[in-house]
Amino acid sequence: MTVYTDPAEIVRAVCAGVSLLVSGNLDQAQREAQLDWLAALYAERTDVRHPLATSGLPLRTRADVRRHFAQAPTRADGIERFEPVGLHVHRTGDPEVVITEFRYEGSAGGRPVSIQNIFVTRVRDGVIIESRDYADHIGAARAFGHLPALAAALAAEEHTQ
């Protein structure tokens, strides 16, 4: 595995790794290796949150992150192409923190896909220790035909509050 030290390189590696996982037509062994590789970019104890997601539950360990990534191919059924584009990394006054703007573009079921993302990521000792991943979950649900499931999850969440 390539050892990354620069926070921008690590976030770019995550984006490219997710792209390969989602659209790379990997066999089971390749998929497992890709999941391990992606998870290894995160610290054993981490704090990854998706504030705009319906569940909003934090990912606290490398194993949580791996399980999260393992769900990606099922969330993206029918994807023909899925790649990060327009990736721009903003350096901050804190050398551990970068803000990354990009979109995943591709196609699913013959329809174009464009999902906007902003990641605020803290990297220490070459691994991600904290990240806030703001993704367009409504756009993703629309692109992958999951709007009814998203609406049901939101309705269920409303009834539990």
Segments from the language model and where they lie:
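Short N-terminal micro-motifs specific to bacterial/archaeal maturation
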Residues: M1, A29, S55-G56, S131
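A beta-strand edge to alpha-helix "cap/lid" segment located at domain peripheries
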Residues: M1-E9, P73-Q161
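Short, mixed-charge, low-aromatic patches
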Residues: A16-Q30, G56-L59, T74-G78, V98-E101
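Flexible loop residues that form catalytic
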Residues: S19, P51, D136
